């Protein structure tokens, strides 16, 4: 099933021929006889797998890297995917424009096929749940001040802000923290190492 790879396999002419042969033989965009999971990977109907979205068409780098990633993974089975990606990025940058041209042409062809198959398609990136949680926690942390009475951190009400930059904590004005004081906050515990200073009157 696997073949040995020698140095001649990396010549630009062989790489171009391999990628075009691979695309014709294996791309589901060339044929319509793939499984539901394969169609999902190439932008087909994904309802069987619980995903109801169309994937973006592959760009030139992705077209090139699909075959290259397999080769690198076979040559270096212990190499992590992140390291393979770095290596592929470097290798792609080292290719000349002439060597990249067939992959740009293939990507253009795939884009045209994608446009014909999904005429109303518009790329809509989804925000990951983890990113949304991190953004919400950053917003909450940026609007908290230490409570002078208990040493705990409490969110400030929006109405409690004064024009001079002072805030209210438990109904009493509190001077905002300086940059040095802000660094003393310990995000891991959420507590302050210093009590609030009363606002100047």
From Swiss-Prot:
Record-level GO cellular component terms: cytoplasm; nuclear speck; nucleus
Cell location: Nucleus speckle; Cytoplasm; Nucleus
Claim: Cytoplasm is one of the keywords in the record: yes
GO BP annotations listed: cell differentiation; male sex determination; sex differentiation
Record's function text: Transcriptional regulator that controls a genetic switch in male development. It is necessary and sufficient for initiating male sex determination by directing the development of supporting cell precursors (pre-Sertoli cells) as Sertoli rather than granulosa cells. Involved in different aspects of gene regulation including promoter activation or repression. Binds to the DNA consensus sequence 5'-[AT]AACAA[AT]-3'. SRY HMG box recognizes DNA by partial intercalation in the minor groove and promotes DNA bending. Also involved in pre-mRNA splicing.
Family: Belongs to the SRY family.
UniProtKB keywords: Activator, Calmodulin-binding, Cytoplasm, Differentiation, DNA-binding, Nucleus, Sexual differentiation, Transcription, Transcription regulation
GO molecular function, one term: calmodulin binding
Subunit structure: Interacts with CALM, EP300, HDAC3, KPNB1, ZNF208 isoform KRAB-O, PARP1, SLC9A3R2 and WT1. The interaction with EP300 modulates its DNA-binding activity. The interaction with KPNB1 is sensitive to dissociation by Ran in the GTP-bound form. Interaction with PARP1 impaired its DNA-binding activity.
InterPro entries: HMG_box_dom (IPR009071), HMG_box_dom_sf (IPR036910), SRY (IPR017253), SRY-related_HMG-box_TF-like (IPR050140)
Polar residues: compositionally biased ranges: 186-195
Name the UniProt record assigns to this protein: Sex-determining region Y protein
DNA-binding region: 54-122
Region feature Disordered, mapped onto this chain: 163-201
């Amino acid at each position: 099933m696997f073949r040995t790879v020698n140095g001649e396999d990396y010549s630009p002419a062989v790489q171009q021929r391999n990628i075009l042969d691979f695309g014709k033989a294996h791309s589901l965009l060339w044929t319509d006889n793939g499984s539901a999971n394969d169609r999902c990977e190439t932008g087909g109907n994904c309802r069987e797998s619980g995903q109801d979205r169309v994937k973006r068409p592959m760009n030139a780098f992705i077209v090139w890297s699909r075959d290259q990633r397999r080769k690198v993974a076979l040559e270096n089975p212990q190499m992590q995917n992140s390291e393979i990606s770095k290596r592929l990025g470097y290798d792609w940058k080292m290719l000349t424009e002439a060597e990249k041209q067939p992959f740009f042409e293939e990507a253009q062809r795939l884009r045209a096929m994608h446009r014909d198959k999904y005429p109303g398609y518009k790329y809509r990136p989804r925000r990951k749940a983890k990113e949304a949680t991190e953004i919400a926690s950053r917003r909450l942390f940026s609007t908290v001040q230490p409570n002078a009475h208990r040493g705990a951190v409490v969110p400030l009400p929006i109405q409690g802000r004064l024009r001079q930059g002072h805030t209210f904590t438990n109904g009493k004005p509190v001077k905002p923290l300086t940059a040095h004081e802000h660094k003393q906050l310990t995000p891991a515990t959420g507590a302050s190492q210093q009590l609030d200073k009363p606002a100047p009157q």
